[in-house]
Amino acid sequence: MKIRLVLLLVLVLGALPAAAQNRALAIFAGGCFWCMEPPFDKLDGVLSTTSGYIGGTMADPTYEQVTAGRTGHYEAVQIEYDPARIGYDRLLEVFWRNIDPVDPTGQFCDKGPQYRSAIFALDEEQRKLAEASKAALDKSGKLPGKVVTEVLSAAKFYAAEDYHQDYYRKNPGRYTFYRWNCGRDSRLQQLWGVPPSR
């Protein structure tokens, strides 16, 4: 009986690290975080998305503090994904196609430091992939200017308030109107030549 219990414990504990290896994180800032969740949520291999704040000087910032533009935080989305099913390089492709990489003042109708675009690398491998992806996009000549999206080292990520999570699902009418009114879809179509993923 004791041998069976020990074997069961070894099997269970041995499986835990394998399960943990099937989860990785990516963090991208692309303007309004409401609009950055849907393109990633649709991808096979993405387990969850969380809207939040990163890169600032204040602990546990609120939406009001961040949108006032005085905390140094970016609105961002944290993506939990299974690297056996989707690679970080694919996440980068989706990120680029859902932002305006040549706008240094924010994204679409949202202007200010909190709405700038950035890739927050969690390790050296992500940094290398992000830098290579940015360089390739710049070199392609497809955009009407230089890519200004920064690749930064990830700092502490703070989840935004609950009412911001899955906003596009909870408030589909308001979300659709916001995207249209902000000019997000028309600018993405202009930049990339294809309708954006919503």
Task: Identify what each model region corresponds to.
Residues 2-5, 21:
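Histidine-/acidic- and/or cysteine-rich, low-complexity loops and terminal segments associated
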